[in-house]
C-alpha cells in the first residue's frame, strides 16, 4: 500500500475516493493530481491511471515521487486537454474543482466516463451563511485532534479559497449530474458520487 508520509485534509479524505473505484477498473483519471499520491493509490486498484495537472512543478514532483508502471502524468489544463470521450472507468478530483469552472469541470468529467463508470469528487466550499458557519463548528476540535496525532504537511499544490457556497455546490452538482449523491464531511469538505447511466 502506498503511504503518504504526511497528513492534511485532502489526504484524510482520499479513502472516500478510493472506496468509489468500481471493481475491475481498467482506466482511471485524477483531475488536478498534484504530487500524484492519489494516482499511486489508484494504481493499486486500477490497471492504468492518468494524473493531469496544469502546474509544471506539481507534475515534476509527481513524476519524481510516483513514477511506476501503469501510471501516466500529463502536464496540461484539464478543461483544454483532448481526452477521448468515454475513455475512463473512473474519474476523480480531490479538492481541485474550485480552481476551475465548477460546472464545466463536472460536465467534462462526466463526458470522459464510459457508461456505468463512476465519478468521485472531494471538494471545498465557502461558508456564506450562519448555517454554514454552525455546521463547521465541530470541525475545529476535530482538526486540532488530527493535527496533534498526525504529521500535517501541505503537498505544495497551489491553494485557493472557494467561491461557491455549500448550497451552490450542491445545486450545481444536482443540475449537472442528475442523481448525484452529495455529502458534507467534517473537515471542511464535501463529496460527490455519481454513476454514468
Label for each model-derived stretch:
Residues 100-109:
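A short, conserved alpha-helix within the catalytic core of class I
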Residues 159-197:
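Conserved Class I S-adenosyl-L-methionine
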Residues 8-26:
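Conserved alpha-helix/loop element of class I SAM-dependent methyltransferases that forms part
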Residues 116-123:
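Conserved beta-strand signature within the Rossmann-like core of class I S-adenosyl-L-methionine
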Residues 35-37, 41-80:
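Class I SAM-dependent methyltransferase SAM/SAH-binding core
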Amino acid at each position: 500500500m502506498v503511504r503518504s508520509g504526511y497528513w492534511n485534509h485532502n489526504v484524510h479524505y482520499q479513502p472516500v475516493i478510493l472506496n468509489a473505484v468500481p471493481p475491475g477498473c481498467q482506466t482511471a483519471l485524477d483531475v488536478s493530481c498534484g504530487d500524484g499520491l492519489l494516482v499511486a493509490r489508484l494504481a493499486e486498484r486500477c490497471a492504468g491511471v492518468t494524473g493531469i495537472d496544469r502546474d509544471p512543478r506539481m507534475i515534476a514532483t509527481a513524476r519524481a515521487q510516483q513514477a511506476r508502471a501503469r501510471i501516466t502524468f500529463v502536464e496540461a489544463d484539464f478543461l483544454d486537454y483532448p481526452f477521448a470521450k468515454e475513455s475512463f472507468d473512473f474519474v476523480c478530483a480531490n479538492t481541485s474543482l474550485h480552481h476551475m469552472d465548477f460546472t464545466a469541470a463536472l460536465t467534462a468529467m462526466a463526458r470522459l466516463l464510459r457508461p456505468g463508470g463512476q465519478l468521485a469528487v472531494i471538494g471545498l466550499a465557502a461558508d456564506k451563511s450562519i448555517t454554514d458557519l454552525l455546521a463547521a463548528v465541530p470541525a475545529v476540535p476535530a482538526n486540532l485532534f488530527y493535527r496533534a496525532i498526525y504529521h500535517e504537511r501541505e503537498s505544495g499544490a497551489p491553494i485557493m479559497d472557494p467561491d461557491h457556497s455549500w448550497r451552490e455546490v450542491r445545486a450545481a452538482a444536482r443540475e449537472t449530474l442528475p442523481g448525484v449523491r452529495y455529502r458534507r464531511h467534517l473537515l471542511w469538505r464535501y463529496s460527490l458520487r455519481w454513476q454514468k447511466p
